[in-house]
Each structure stands twice: as structure tokens, then as C-alpha cells.
């Protein structure tokens, strides 16, 4: 069976994946970071979701080496009350 080409193939491809996915890259590798600091709360907040969970590497594009450091840094910052455990404390 011949491979589909032309406009039909392009339409079919767009229908399968309607959202454009940007190529993921590791922010820490690009910046040349050696160690992730637990005191840098602004950077750490970017990797915490709305519900307070740590965003996985498959969504952020962070390399495994830095994801482990990020996990430890967030947990340390939470323990020292630099970051909240949850996003909103509702009474």
C-alpha cells in the first residue's frame, strides 16, 4: 500500500495531534547550574503544581539528575517553611 502524501496526509497528521508540543529542554542544563539551591524559592515554585505536588520530569523536561536534586530541594524548603506544603490553606 503506498504511503499517503500531500494535503490529505497533512490534514490527518494535524487531526491526530491538534496541540502543538514544544520540544522539552532542561532549564538547569541550559543555565549551567551545578547544584539546585533550596533557598531559591522562585525557581522551585515553577516546578510545583496548583495542588502542591512536584511536577514530574516528563512534563517539565528536566533531566533525571536535576529532577532528583529538585525533589530534595523542594522537600528541604518545605521542611524549613520556605515553601508551603499545599498551595492554599483554606479554613
Swiss-Prot record:
GO terms for cellular component: cytosolic small ribosomal subunit. Transmembrane segments: none annotated. It comes from the Bacteria. InterPro entries: Ribosomal_bS18 (IPR001648), Ribosomal_bS18_CS (IPR018275), Ribosomal_bS18_sf (IPR036870). One of its GO terms (biological process) is translation. The keyword Electron transport does not apply. Binds as a heterodimer with protein bS6 to the central domain of the 16S rRNA, where it helps stabilize the platform of the 30S subunit. This is Small ribosomal subunit protein bS18. It comes from Burkholderia ambifaria (strain MC40-6). The gene is rpsR.
Amino acid at each position: 500500500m503506498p504511503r499517503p502524501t500531500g494535503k490529505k496526509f497533512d490534514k490527518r497528521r494535524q487531526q491526530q495531534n491538534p496541540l502543538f508540543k514544544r520540544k522539552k529542554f532542561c532549564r538547569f542544563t541550559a543555565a549551567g547550574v551545578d547544584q539546585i539551591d533550596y533557598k531559591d524559592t522562585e525557581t522551585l515554585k515553577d516546578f510545583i503544581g496548583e495542588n502542591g505536588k512536584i511536577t514530574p520530569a516528563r512534563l517539565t523536561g528536566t533531566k533525571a539528575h536535576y529532577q532528583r536534586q529538585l525533589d530534595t530541594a523542594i522537600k528541604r524548603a518545605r521542611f524549613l517553611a520556605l515553601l508551603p506544603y499545599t498551595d492554599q490553606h483554606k479554613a
